Amino acid sequence: MFDSTLNPLWQRYILAVQEEVKPALGCTEPISLALAAAVAAAELEGPVERVEAWVSPNLMKNGLGVTVPGTGMVGLPIAAALGALGGNANAGLEVLKDATAQAIADAKALLAAGKVSVKIQEPCNEILFSRAKVWNGEKWACVTIVGGHTNIVHIETHNGVVFTQQACVAEGEQESPLTVLSRTTLAEILKFVNEVPFAAIRFILDSAKLNCALSQEGLSGKWGLHIGATLEKQCERGLLAKDLSSSIVIRTSAASDARMGGATLPAMSNSGSGNQGITATMPVVVVAEHFGADDERLARALMLSHLSAIYIHNQLPRLSALCAATTAAMGAAAGMAWLVDGRYETISMAISSMIGDVSGMICDGASNSCAMKVSTSASAAWKAVLMALDDTAVTGNEGIVAHDVEQSIANLCALASHSMQQTDRQIIEIMASKAR
């Protein structure tokens, strides 16, 4: 429940964060399909004997090369199979949290028997689309998710339609928090962060708790490309400085290593992505620890980071050719700048420099290499903050950066939303040719 004395706009900000910053176990694209399969299995009369699935090209792109937690296997077929046989239909993005060793073995057996198929939905106008149909003999159940990783729009069985999401909005219904957020500004977000009661945003500290645990697991060196663990070793060997900049990169990339390598620990996601949640969280946590910030100061910095990341990503397609670790790191830059300096000018300069630095990074699907992009984005964020502290930034005379940070963000998002659509198609074509 909200404090009734809170500014209504602030209430919408908090709702936006609560909707977009959630625990997620495993990369969220295959997990979206696993959820569809789990919900379908819950509707099926009898045990699952066969699974069919269809996904959008973008979801296929992000599901081809990522490890599904607990399985040691990559790809959408194992996600669909495990969701159907061991998923918790009520757990959202943590659908696989209760999967047992037996369920994993059964899912692998179903896969080996050729009873699982995943195809691209054609035609498909949706960026994020997953549909799972599970069978028991002639009986079946089918679930469709569209637009958001957990947004179930249709449930149907051989007996008929169970549920269909109504597209219309009831008269007098409040606008969604993201719609409200689309009309705000970074200056208004900063005012909120500075003035909102700590008790109203204390919950954001959970992002530090979850993502720090994931980072610690990643430092074991067992996961993914073990970038964080490797860089930590290089510090011990004297090849990399043991300083704040290194700590930011090491601890952030370690969390992504564990995330993408299939560790069975949840990440606190942002905008439907664990890596975005990690990127918006870990750099801020490391800087807060460096300065000895208390819980309230950390919570305000994390709220600024996560809300800024959501604000920017809300102007993008849910999935695109632009690596969204870059936009999440713009949020992190804001949070770190606030911890060190607190001024709007420093925050806006840091974000502008980020846009002038890493905005061209492509998303070529979810995989272990995402941790490389996460580490690059985290490093760029801290560099941008250091520049801003010295009153230096990429200016409006250069490239897509404008004189106003809001216009710079709009320019970046226009590039991703329009011109990079062809880039996205080319990436998907290249990846599909590799999978043949």
Swiss-Prot record:
Q: Which GO biological process categories is it annotated with?
A: L-cysteine catabolic process to pyruvate
Q: Which InterPro entries match?
A: Ser_deHydtase-like_asu, UPF0597
Q: Name one Pfam family in it.
A: SDH_alpha
UniProt-recorded name of the protein: UPF0597 protein YhaM
GO molecular function list = L-cysteine desulfhydrase activity
Q: What family is this protein classified in?
A: Belongs to the UPF0597 family.
